[in-house]
């Protein structure tokens, strides 16, 4: 956690961040599973109040500053979506073990629905990684994969899953 060893719930309040309700699974799985001192989340989408924050593939914005009209998502919009998906992952952890049980973020895997030629996946998934740093300080530093894919469920631009270490 942070240098002051503040409880995670206190740090969230300091930052003005409220964890959302756990998103309902869209298929046959559970949001999170605990094995020993690790919690694995299922892939989380950027749902806000039951609605996807954005939809479509991520592509660079044109020189005129506009995305094309084919359901495109800008890298900046996708970065925001990754942050929301990360919050949803934390909500799944909170629902299973309580957010104050989290010792550290171990691994983040981020999937980015990418238009042909888009290779900015690391920058998109930074939306999740930076959130974990804000909340957990050094304990938010983690191993990570940022993977470009052709399609994601429900036409979401990003999906984030995490592995966290919790108190035994």
What is the role of each PLM region?
Residues 2-168:
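Short, polar/acidic, helix-capping and beta-turn segments at strand->helix junctions
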């Amino acid at each position: 956690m942070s240098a002051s060893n503040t409880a995670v719930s206190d740090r969230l309040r300091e930052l003005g961040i409220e964890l959302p309700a756990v998103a309902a699974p869209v298929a046959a799985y559970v949001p999170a599973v605990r094995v020993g001192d690790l919690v694995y989340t299922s892939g989380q989408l950027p749902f806000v109040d039951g609605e996807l924050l954005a939809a479509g593939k991520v592509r660079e914005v044109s020189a005129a500053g506009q995305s094309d009209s084919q359901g495109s998502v800008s890298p900046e919009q996708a970065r925001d979506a990754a942050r929301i998906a990360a919050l949803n992952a934390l909500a799944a952890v909170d629902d299973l073990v309580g957010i104050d049980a989290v010792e550290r973020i171990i691994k983040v895997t981020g999937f980015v629905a990418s238009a042909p030629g888009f290779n900015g996946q690391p920058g998109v998934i930074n939306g999740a990684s930076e959130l974990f740093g804000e909340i957990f300080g050094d304990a938010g530093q983690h191993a990570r994969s940022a993977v470009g894919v052709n399609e994601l469920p429900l036409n979401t631009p990003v999906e984030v899953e995490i592995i966290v270490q919790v108190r035994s």
